[in-house]
C-alpha cells in the first residue's frame, strides 16, 4: 500500500518478472518494487495439482489470503480434501461444513453439482444432475426446492413423473411458515389431487440415497476390476 502511494497516480508497469517489477511514474521516474513470491509459487502448485506441496507452503507462510487462494483453487479443481484443509485453517466453519456435506454425497455428479451451486451456477448444477447416468432426478428437484424455484422443481417432477408429492410437501411447509396461502393455479390443482404422506416421502428419500450408494459401489467395483 505504501509503495502504491510512492508510485502516485497514472503510473505504468514497465516490467514484471518473478517477484520484481519496474514502474514508471507520471513524472518519468523509474522505480522498482517487489511482491511476495508465495502467491506465484502457490499458483504453480495449484495448476500442477500438487496439493500437498500447496498446503505445505500455506502452513509455512501462515497467511490467510494464501489459504483463501488455495481453498478457491482446490474447490475449482474439485479437490475437496485440500479445500477442507484450507477452510479449516481459516476457521471458516460454515463453508467447511458445506464442503464436508459435499464430500458425503455418494456420486461424483452430485458433488460436482453442489460445487457448481457453491459457485453460484444453479443452472449448471441442474444440468449436471439431469445429464448424469442415470439422471439424479430427486437431487435436481430438491436443489430447486432449496433455491425456492418451486415452478422449476414441479416441472421436473411432472416431466419425470416422480416426487410430485415431495414438491407439494415442501411447498406446503414453506407457505405455512410464511403464513401464506397457495396462489399458483397448478399447485392448487395438485394439492386437490395428490395425497401428501410424510412417511412415504421420507421413505422415498431414503431409497434414493440407497440407490446412489449402490451406484457408487458398483462404479467403485468397476474401477477396481479395470486395474487388473
Residue ranges and their predicted role:
Residues 1-228:
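Extended alpha-helical assembly domains of large eukaryotic scaffold proteins
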Amino acid at each position: 500500500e505504501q509503495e502504491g502511494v510512492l508510485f502516485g497516480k497514472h503510473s505504468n508497469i514497465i516490467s514484471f518478472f518473478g517477484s520484481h517489477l519496474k514502474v514508471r511514474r507520471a513524472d518519468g521516474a523509474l522505480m522498482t518494487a517487489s511482491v511476495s513470491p508465495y502467491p506465484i509459487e502457490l499458483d504453480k502448485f495449484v495448476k500442477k495439482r500438487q496439493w500437498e506441496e500447496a498446503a505445505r507452503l500455506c502452513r509455512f507462510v501462515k497467511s490467510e489470503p494464501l489459504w483463501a487462494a488455495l481453498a478457491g483453487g482446490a474447490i475449482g479443481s474439485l479437490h475437496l480434501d485440500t479445500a477442507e484443509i484450507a477452510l479449516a485453517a481459516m476457521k471458516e466453519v460454515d463453508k467447511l461444513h458445506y464442503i464436508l456435506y459435499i464430500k458425503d454425497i455418494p456420486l461424483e455428479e452430485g458433488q460436482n453439482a453442489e460445487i457448481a451451486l457453491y459457485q453460484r451456477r444453479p443452472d449448471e448444477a441442474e444440468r449436471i444432475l439431469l445429464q448424469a447416468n442415470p439422471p439424479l432426478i430427486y437431487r435436481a428437484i430438491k436443489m430447486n426446492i432449496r433455491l425456492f424455484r418451486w415452478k422449476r422443481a414441479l416441472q421436473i417432477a411432472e416431466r419425470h413423473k416422480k416426487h410430485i408429492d415431495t414438491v407439494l410437501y415442501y411447498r406446503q411447509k414453506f407457505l405455512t411458515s410464511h403464513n401464506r396461502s397457495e396462489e399458483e393455479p397448478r399447485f392448487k390443482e395438485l394439492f386437490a389431487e395428490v395425497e401428501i404422506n410424510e412417511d412415504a416421502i421420507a421413505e422415498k428419500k431414503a431409497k434414493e440415497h440407497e440407490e446412489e450408494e449402490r451406484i457408487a459401489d458398483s462404479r467403485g467395483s468397476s474401477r477396481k476390476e479395470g486395474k487388473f
